[in-house]
């Protein structure tokens, strides 16, 4: 409370922020997700926009994908955070599931999950829990994530990683293993970030959407379309 009061008293008048949010905030989000020395940041292959929590980031991403791939089907894990289905259905997508949890082992059923991904049509959107799977808490190993990345590449799938609990499993950097593997793959993908839990700012709706592209030029085009989506939300 003391720190908040000091910042409020010292703050200059508030002007308009960019549509995509404060540059410093978006840069910090990228450094946290991808690492400060990330090649995709250095090459301008990622764009980030501030969002109203992870929910807002998911919805902005869903609306953008709907403009680009309107006939896609979205696949979420079985089980998944209940709002995943509601968000993508509200954006106009049919939503199906891929197998994820094995109640006998109380762990992830990676074999069944990857087999399902390898059967999906190109252009399908795959919502993935980057760490701390909700509601099971069962995460994939690094080797299993590598197989997921390979399946997405082979089938031409659209990965959408939901990072709501970075730092709550094994630490900030270890929890980014899925993001790092996708970054190294050369694929385009989406990442929704929520910092409500990480920063204990539950009432502030602190989130972001990051989109990894194929080039700096493509990033500029994606950012232009992303701004249009944000302005209409």
PLM segments and residue spans:
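Walker B catalytic acidic pair
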Residues: 163
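Conserved core segment of the aminotransferase class I/II
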Residues: 184-233
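Short catalytic/ligand-binding loop motif for oxyanion handling, primarily in non-cytosolic enzymes
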Residues: 1, 135-136, 200-201
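Phosphate-/polyanion-interacting regions in eukaryotic proteins
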Residues: 1-7
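Generic detector of contiguous secondary-structure segments
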Residues: 11-17, 188, 193
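Conserved core of the PLP fold type I
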Residues: 12-156, 166-168, 172-183
């Amino acid at each position: 409370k003391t720190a908040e009061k000091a910042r409020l008293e010292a703050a200059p008048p508030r002007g308009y922020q960019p549509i995509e949010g404060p540059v410093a905030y978006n840069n910090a989000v990228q450094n946290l997700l991808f690492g400060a020395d990330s090649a995709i940041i250095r090459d301008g292959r990622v764009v980030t926009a501030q969002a109203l929590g992870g929910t807002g980031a998911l919805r902005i991403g869903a609306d953008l994908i709907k403009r680009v791939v309107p006939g896609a089907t979205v696949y979420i894990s079985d089980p998944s955070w209940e709002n995943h289905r509601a968000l993508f259905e509200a954006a106009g997508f049919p939503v199906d599931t891929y197998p994820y949890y094995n109640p006998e082992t109380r762990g992830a059923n990676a074999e069944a999950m990857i087999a399902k991904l390898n059967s999906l049509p190109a252009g399908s959107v795959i919502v993935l829990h980057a760490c701390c799977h909700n509601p099971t808490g069962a995460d994939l190993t690094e080797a299993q994530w590598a197989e997921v990345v390979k399946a997405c590449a082979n089938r031409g799938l659209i990965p959408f990683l939901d990072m709501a609990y970075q730092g709550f499993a094994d630490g900030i950097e270890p929890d980014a293993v899925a993001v790092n593997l996708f970054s190294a793959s050369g694929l385009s993908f989406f990442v929704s970030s929520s910092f409500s839990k990480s920063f204990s700012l539950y009432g502030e709706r602190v989130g972001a959407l990051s989109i990894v592209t194929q080039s700096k030029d493509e990033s500029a085009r994606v950012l232009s379309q992303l701004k249009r989506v944000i302005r209409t939300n």
